[in-house]
Amino acid sequence: MKIGIVGLGRVGSSTAFALLMKGFAREMVLIDVDKKRAEGDALDLIHGTPFTRRANIYAGDYADLKGSDVVIVAAGVPQKPGETRLQLLGRNARVMKEIARNVSKYAPDSIVIVVTNPVDVLTYFFLKESGMDPRKVFGSGTVLDTARLRTLIAQHCGFSPRSVHVYVIGEHGDSEVPVWSGAMIGGIPLQNMCQICQKCDSKILENFAEKTKRAAYEIIERKGATHYAIALAVADIVESIFFDEKRVLTLSVYLEDYLGVKDLCISVPVTLGKHGVERILELNLNEEELEAFRKSASILKNAINEITAEENKHQNTSG
């Protein structure tokens, strides 16, 4: 598998390392506006290949993306402490459009994973600018949020996170929606499990949801960025593609019409295989969850409309 990574900040470089450790990249091209940084990362990773499977890793340009199976987009300005993901939009939208034009030119048949925040909006801009197949362009979405929530529940209830099944959908950010109505531990509905163990109540579950939502902010406040967990999440996504696992993951995908949400990239459960997104799964949400999901979609739609209006204004002024 040939993998291209655009953007070698902490997320991009950590993702390259995670992919090297997974061992399924025979070729990895690293692209960054700072070519020396990309070259440094490539050398550092190459020196680790005696301890992993052999891989050809090098710094390159967009033209080197030709023949890539997967392209990971992690380029963008970093999130500031206290800054929401949506506030990042204006600073990253133009960067994303430029990347989209180059990726579609040199690797039009690749599967593209957008990681840059705010991921839902930027995935939408990438898709629209590139004109690529919507099944092959998606964002990392709420994969990490889902993992965070499962971890919190597992730690509290004393189970492995792998035995906890719950999804976080909607925006990867402040308006994300935990789907409590479908939450299970080992096949037992979470509400029933809570009654058995008598450890959980609605306030505790609400606290889990809030901790999940605030996790990135807390990490950024302490160390400046989140990068290890998201790198592992992206490597996990690529693994599902490589092995054609058809796993169900909450990715930010383009929706034509999903529970009343149209023309938007937002996180919902999908099956992912070697050809990209194969199925979009429609959840049976309760009224409260459905309302929250549509509200989340509305927030993202408004953000897209605002930046589109700004872009049109800028073009008219410059023209």
Swiss-Prot record:
Long-term stability up to 80 degrees Celsius. Fructose 1,6-bisphosphate (FBP) increases the thermal stability at 90 degrees Celsius (pH 6.0). The modification Phosphotyrosine is found at residue 217. Belongs to the LDH/MDH superfamily. LDH family. Transmembrane segments: none annotated. Allosterically activated by fructose 1,6-bisphosphate (FBP). Inactivated by Mn(2+), Co(2+), Cd(2+) and Zn(2+). GO terms for biological process: glycolytic process; lactate metabolic process; pyruvate metabolic process. Keywords: Allosteric enzyme, Cytoplasm, NAD, Oxidoreductase, Phosphoprotein. Substrate binds at residues 79, 85, 117-120, 145-148, 226. Its main location: cytoplasm. Coiled coil: none annotated. It comes from Thermotoga maritima (strain ATCC 43589 / DSM 3109 / JCM 10099 / NBRC 100826 / MSB8). It is found in: Cytoplasm. NAD(+) binds at residues 10-11, 32, 37, 62, 76-77, 115-117, 140. GO terms for molecular function: L-lactate dehydrogenase activity. Pfam families: Ldh_1_C, Ldh_1_N. InterPro entries: L-lactate/malate_DH, L-lactate_DH, L-lactate_DH_AS, Lactate/malate_DH_C, Lactate/malate_DH_N, Lactate_DH/Glyco_Ohase_4_C, NAD(P)-bd_dom_sf. This is L-lactate dehydrogenase. One of its GO terms (cellular component) is cytoplasm. It catalyses: (S)-lactate + NAD(+) = pyruvate + NADH + H(+).
